[in-house]
A protein has these predicted regions:
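Long, acidic, intrinsically disordered low-complexity segments
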Residues: 37-63, 77-111, 191-208
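Extreme N-terminal leader/anchor segments
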Residues: 1-82
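Aromatic-lined, polymer-binding surfaces characteristic
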Residues: 94-242
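A near-ubiquitous, low-amplitude feature marking generic local secondary-structure context
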Residues: 3-10, 14, 88, 92, ...
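Short clusters of hydrophobic/aromatic residues that line enzyme substrate/ligand-binding pockets
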Residues: 72, 87, 237
Length: 242
């Protein structure tokens, strides 16, 4: 990592530390402590990704080969694409569809990081980006959209390594559009965990994307307030839902 990239990462972390309350700092520090600087990708662009937060969830590199073979196993259901776009097939359940469209499975591809898995990740994301935009349904549910934004930001090093400029621009346009939609629908998001997920996604976006920097202060404040409101003194959620 070059000196300028290290400065950019440190600056972003410093901003988040200054603006966030203790609860919010804990959440973001865990994810950004091992963040990856992305400034080396197309330096100088004002719409570029600066850092990628660390994904702390468990990974299984063997699942990358299943996905490459077109087998998508989520929520106890298996769908095989047989060469078709997985996004065009009928989902076997809403939970399966939510897992697919949350893009959390990208972390398994990153665990098996290779030229093949990177190309596979880009191909699948391109499939999603190329779909006609029809807002509504599971893919545009607040909690699913928030998970997708977080996953795409976290797995940007996998997706953008070896990518050409055209894919980079498509990826960023789509990501920015989804972030904008999250901000627009914020007032309608139900209370509880979904609202918290959306605020975390928006805070990540403001810290990771150069074109979202103007939202750092408001996103950080809203996340800090929501964490203070929803988290109990013992660290549990007020719903007591594990």
């Amino acid at each position: 990592m070059g000196d300028s990239a290290e400065v950019a990462v440190a600056h972003r972390r410093g901003i988040s530390s200054l603006l966030l309350g203790r609860a919010a700092r804990t959440v973001l520090a865990r994810a950004s402590g091992q963040s990856v600087a992305l400034s080396r990708f197309w330096p100088g662009r004002t719409d570029r990704l600066l850092i990628a937060p660390n994904d702390l969830r468990t990974v299984d590199a063997t699942r990358a080969s299943e996905i490459y073979a077109g087998r998508f196993v989520f929520a106890g259901k298996i769908v095989t694409s047989h060469g078709r776009s997985i996004f065009e097939l009928d989902p076997p359940s809403e939970d399966w569809e939510a897992s697919l469209l949350g893009f959390g499975w990208l972390r398994h591809l990153r665990a098996a990081d290779s030229a093949i898995t990177r190309a596979n990740a880009r191909s699948l994301i391109d499939d999603w980006i190329s779909k006609p935009i029809r807002k509504g349904g599971t893919g545009w549910r607040a909690d699913v959209l928030a998970r997708r934004v977080i996953s795409l930001l976290s797995q940007a090093p996998l997706v953008l390594n070896d990518a050409d400029g055209k894919f980079y621009r498509r990826f960023l346009r789509s990501l920015t559009r989804e972030i904008r939609y999250l901000r627009y629908t914020m007032v309608d998001i139900p209370d509880g965990v979904p609202r918290l997920q959306v605020l975390i996604a928006l805070c990540y976006a403001s810290l990771c994307l150069a074109n979202q920097a103007k939202h750092i202060r408001s996103s950080s404040r809203k996340l800090s307030e929501e964490l203070t409101r929803q988290l109990l003194p013992d660290g549990g959620h007020l719903s007591r839902n594990p």
